[in-house]
Amino acid sequence: MGSSLYDILTIVMIAEFIFGNVTNGFIVLTNCIAWLSKRTLSFIGWIQLFLAISRVVLIWEMLLAWLKYMKYSFSYLAGTELRVMMLTWVVSNHFSLWLATILSIFYLLKIASFSRPVFLYLKWRVKKVLLLILLGNLIFLMFNILQINTHIEDWMDQYKRNITWDSRVNEFVGFSNLVLLEMIMFSVTPFTVALVSFILLIFSLWKHLQKMHLSSRGERDPSTKAHVNALRIMVSFLLLYATYFISFFISLIPMAHKKGLDLMFSLTVGLFYPSSHSFILILGHSNLRHSSCLVITYLRCKEKD
């Protein structure tokens, strides 16, 4: 049973890895081509580009962690290699979450219609607001790196002191749990901001539909379509990142560390977020969707030839 489950999880993980690289690679390629051909790229184009790059790094980091664990178990978990892997994961995870949150804020400010002076002030200065948020989240990243680096230093000291294999394994379980808890703690703020943006956009859509109903106009006007499309992208991000959270909590289950399948299962669940959300971004953005249709048409023509 354990062997069969392991094989199934391996197949699913490889499929997610390929799918994630294809979808995120497509976003990177599309925006790079647009930038090179037009010599310019929209602000959201840059956000999409760096979001996709961060997710490619995150996907590869998760795969490398799995391969290292399968080959060397706990014996490699010390030194510069551990530091590089941990900090790369922290940085890629940070930007993957924060850039998606910035997209959610962009949808809210661009699409929602509120008459509050504060909202109108932010709406008219949307690029400056998003740039300030982007710069401000670097403070979170700095503190996160400092905290993780402290845990790494503590683990390195314990690794040198503890000679027996069992003691090193137990110490690493404690170290990994601390790192995961830090990741969860630093993810709460951007996730909450994205959730609030989603709720406000729902409220904006409700108000808009009320106005449309009173004026006896159709409900499928451009503003309604923009609201619905943005909400689809935002709810998919929230749900998929929630599964990513769940993968963290799975890794925190004490008994799972003794069975060997915890890493496989948590990585399989975790990979679903960076792989799938980028596909939804492609479907939700007209330029990416148009480019994907051109690629599919080209491939079909090549297949017929």
From Swiss-Prot:
A Gene Ontology molecular function term of the record: taste receptor activity
Endpoints of the signal sequence: none
InterPro entries (alphabetical): TAS2R
Keywords tagged on the record: G-protein coupled receptor, Glycoprotein, Membrane, Receptor, Sensory transduction, Taste, Transducer, Transmembrane, Transmembrane helix
GO CC term, one of those recorded: membrane
SUPFAM superfamilies: Family A G protein-coupled receptor-like (SSF81321)
Transmembrane stretches, start-end: 8-28, 43-63, 89-109, 129-149, 183-203, 233-253, 263-283
Superkingdom of the source species: Eukaryota
Segments on the Cytoplasmic side according to the record's topology features: 29-42, 110-128, 204-232, 284-305
Tissue expression summary: Expressed in subsets of taste receptor cells of the tongue and palate epithelium and exclusively in gustducin-positive cells. Expressed in 15% taste bud cells in circumvallate and foliate papillae but only in 2% in fungiform papillae. Expressed in the duodenum, antrum and fundus (part of the stomach).
Subcellular location: Membrane
UniProt-listed Pfam families: TAS2R
Major location category of this protein: membrane
Topological domain spans for side Extracellular: 1-7, 64-88, 150-182, 254-262
Record membrane topology: Multi-pass membrane protein
Glycosylation sites: N162
Further details from the record: Most taste cells may be activated by a limited number of bitter compounds; individual taste cells can discriminate among bitter stimuli.
UniProt family annotation: Belongs to the G-protein coupled receptor T2R family.
Role: Receptor that may play a role in the perception of bitterness and is gustducin-linked. May play a role in sensing the chemical composition of the gastrointestinal content. The activity of this receptor may stimulate alpha gustducin, mediate PLC-beta-2 activation and lead to the gating of TRPM5.
Protein name: Taste receptor type 2 member 13
